[in-house]
A protein has these predicted regions:
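Ankyrin-repeat TPLH-centered helix-turn motif and closely related helix/turn capping elements
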Residues: 300, 308-409
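The feature captures the LRR N-terminal capping module
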Residues: 1-285, 292-295, 305, 363, ...
């Protein structure tokens, strides 16, 4: 008597198998039945520790996913996968990449991130069809001395972030098709001049390094839209920045800038400019030429004045200059008719210009202790000038002493939890990186609708998130081991847990 065999057991022509999140400890034996036809194999997020010899008989594979396993070795037999186009072995325990990887000539997308690698194979440039390479978070200390990036001429995305790289080879300028370059979280003190050859580069992230200067040749990045150079040691920005006509996002927060070049006003496509935590005394007059600028953040600088040209930023919607030394806001600010949020808390303002009443503000922050985004103002006269002015219960501004418990920081300043808050009113104010802006509907809308509030916080870059998590974990360990903090350990840990959860 004949029994019907399930159709799937008869079918020897299977091109794709997806076994992700299946708690696999071993590679399933049945996979090898389809060695002649299998082109896509996804074994991500399992508990695989090794790849058996038989595994490398799947020579038809074009896409192989092995991320988030416990694989401890990538055998030299990887060379058998000569038709492989995509390889993802990220977040495993692989200590080295075999030199035989160079035989995978068809490889276009390779992700080795999150492994305990300390070096790349010398043969890596032989992968001449690579378009996307991720080797971030692998403790890489240097690139091969003889690496010739010109052989990887098709490379479009290169992620070297969160390693220990001190120098970049000059040959990086040969990656003429490169669109995205991540170098964040390394030990770079300079960038090679040749980086200016990357005419097609759209995004450059060199945040969290040790850069003291940028090369003038950066002006050659004529396609650049995103430039992130946060958390470095920069004191100046080259005038060549003005030649980046397509630049939309510029983040230079947490550096040592004392001034911005006038050339920044030539970045005609700029929509977001982040200058937080520098040493700026003023902003360039040319900033008024940035007609597309919608978000300008210069919190925690040393600004003593604002140029009247700031009113020329006709698209500006959010303007933050919290914790500076401003004594007045220029009346021309009212010309920025799209402005909805103005944060001037923590300054030395005596009053506000009457012209601000022309703006349709949804939030005007004058103090950390302000309970509502909008206040009731009265008109008065400035007896020194005779001009009409605005005043309220929070003007003139008085120094405040924020506490760590009241204002838990945005992870970038978690060290405040173990340092005493300074008592000096203006000069050495405790760093508070909570830039929270609450939006509410206009008073007219409140009459018709329920009152609603939205808490807006600056969205961290993905690289910053990883740094934030490490900072929180290290701080927790240090504080728990410190003497004299036992009494408030629970309170601090509870605070850190809240921050960790938000990350």
């Amino acid at each position: 008597m004949f029994h019907c065999i399930p159709l799937w057991r008869c079918n020897r022509h299977v091109e794709s198998i997806d076994k992700r999140h299946c708690s696999l400890v071993y590679v399933p034996e049945e996979i090898y039945r389809y060695a002649r036809s299998l082109e896509e194999l996804l074994l991500d997020a399992n508990q695989l520790r090794e790849l058996p010899e038989q595994f490398f008989q799947l020579v038809k594979l074009r896409k192989l996913g092995l991320s988030d396993n416990e694989i401890q070795r990538l055998p030299p037999e990887i060379a058998n996968f000569m038709q492989l186009v995509e390889l993802d072995v990220s977040r495993n325990e692989i200590p080295e990449i075999p030199e035989s990887i160079s035989f995978c000539k068809a490889l276009q997308v390779a992700d080795f991130s999150g492994n305990p690698l300390t070096r790349l194979p010398e043969s890596f440039p032989e992968l001449q069809n690579l378009t996307c390479l991720s080797v971030n978070d692998i403790s890489l200390q240097s690139l091969p001395e003889n690496i010739v990036f010109s052989k990887c001429a098709l490379l479009e995305e290169l992620d070297l972030g969160n390693n220990e790289i001190y120098n970049l080879p000059e040959s990086i300028g040969a990656l003429l098709h490169l669109k995205d370059l991540w170098l964040d979280g390394n030990q770079l003190s300079e960038l090679p001049q040749e980086i200016g050859n990357l005419k097609n580069l759209l995004c450059l992230d060199v945040s969290e390094n040790r850069l003291e200067r940028l090369p003038e040749e950066i002006s050659g990045l004529t396609s650049l839209t995103d430039l992130v150079i946060s958390q470095n040691l920069l004191e100046t920005i080259p005038d060549g920045i003005g030649k980046l006509k397509k630049l939309s996002i510029l983040k230079v927060d947490q550096n040592r800038l004392t001034q911005l070049p006038e050339a920044v006003g030539d970045c005609e496509s700029l929509t977001e400019l982040v200058l937080t935590e520098n040493q700026l005394l003023t902003l360039p007059k040319s900033i008024g030429k940035l007609k597309k600028l919608s978000n300008l953040n210069a919190d925690r600088n040393k600004l003593v004045s604002l140029p009247k040209e700031i009113g020329g930023c006709c698209s500006l919607t959010v303007f933050c200059v919290r914790d500076n030394r401003l004594t007045r806001i220029p009346a021309e600010m009212s010309q920025a008719t799209e402005l909805h949020v103005l944060d001037v808390a923590g300054n030395r303002l005596l009053h506000l210009p009457l012209s601000l009443t022309a703006l349709k503000l949804k939030a005007l922050w004058l103090s950390d202790n302000q309970s509502q985004p909008l206040l009731t103002f009265q008109t008065d006269t400035d007896y020194t000038t005779g001009e009409k002015i605005l005043t309220c219960v929070l003007l003139p501004q008085l120094p405040s002493e924020p506490t760590c418990q009241e204002n838990l920081p945005r992870c970038g300043a978690l060290e405040n939890l173990v340092n005493d808050v300074s008592d000096e009113a203006w000069n050495e104010r405790a760093v508070n990186r909570v830039s929270a802006i609450r939006f509410v509907e206009d008073e007219k809308d409140e009459e018709d609708n329920e009152t609603r509030t939205l808490l807006r916080r600056a969205t961290p870059h993905p690289g910053e998130l990883k740094h934030m998590k490490k900072t929180v974990e290290n701080l927790r360990n240090d504080m728990n081991a410190a003497k004299g903090l036992d009494s408030n350990k629970n309170e601090v840990n509870h605070a850190i847990d809240r921050v960790t959860t938000s990350v």
